[in-house]
Every structure is written in C-alpha cells, then in structure tokens.
C-alpha cells in the first residue's frame, strides 16, 4: 500500500514505515501530523485517484526531527568585469515517520 501526498508545494510517494523529509511544519518532535491532501492511494482493493484529492483520504505520521539541508552556493558572474556575487542558502525541513494510510 502506498499513497501520494501533497505538502509544502511538493508531492511525495509514501508507504507506512517510511521516513520522509518534507518542507518545515509547525509541529514539535513526537507530535502527530495528518496530511489531508492525498492525490492517490494504491491498496489491495485497487487504485483511488483524486480529482484533485481523494475524498476521505488521510495519511498520518509522527514528527521525528527538524533539521536543515546542506548549504547550496549561488554565484553570479559578470563576464570580463571582475565582478562576482556569492550567496548561500540552507532550507529547513521536518522529518516525518509515516504511520498509517486510510481511505
């Protein structure tokens, strides 16, 4: 059984027991979170595809930790002008352990 959920502007394919790094959520470590925006659920009964979301579909999980992704470097050059601009960015994330998928 698996599902496709939408959170933080991205889509994730999840199964019970998976650990997923999603965009930062307002939840403490150990707290349960529910994802209501379920796009697809595949189970033994068949596939349920939402238009856009599966009605009654829900994925629950537990927040494991909060963290930050590795730094990415942004560099802009102006050719032949001896000009360079550097910046860096680290995106926050929340790691979630998927517990249950229900339709």
From Swiss-Prot:
InterPro entries the record matches: bL21-like (IPR028909), bL21-like_sf (IPR036164), Ribosomal_bL21 (IPR001787), Ribosomal_bL21_CS (IPR018258)
UniProt keywords, alphabetically: Ribonucleoprotein, Ribosomal protein, RNA-binding, rRNA-binding
Any single biological process term in GO: translation
Gene Ontology CC terms, in alphabetical order: cytoplasm; ribonucleoprotein complex; ribosome
Summary of the function given for this chain in its UniProt record: This protein binds to 23S rRNA in the presence of protein L20.
NCBIfam families cross-referenced by the UniProt entry: L21
Protein name in the entry: Large ribosomal subunit protein bL21
Gene: rplU
């Amino acid at each position: 059984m698996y599902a496709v959920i939408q959170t933080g502007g991205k889509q994730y394919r999840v199964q019970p027991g998976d650990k997923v790094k999603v965009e930062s959520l307002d939840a403490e470590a150990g707290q349960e979170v529910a994802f209501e925006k379920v796009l697809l659920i595949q189970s033994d009964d068949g596939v349920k595809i939402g238009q856009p979301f599966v009605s009654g579909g829900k994925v629950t999980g537990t927040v494991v930790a909060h963290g930050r992704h590795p730094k990415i470097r942004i560099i802009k050059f102006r050719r032949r002008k001896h000009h360079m601009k550097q910046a860096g960015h680290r995106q926050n994330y929340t790691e979630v352990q998927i517990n249950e998928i229900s339709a």
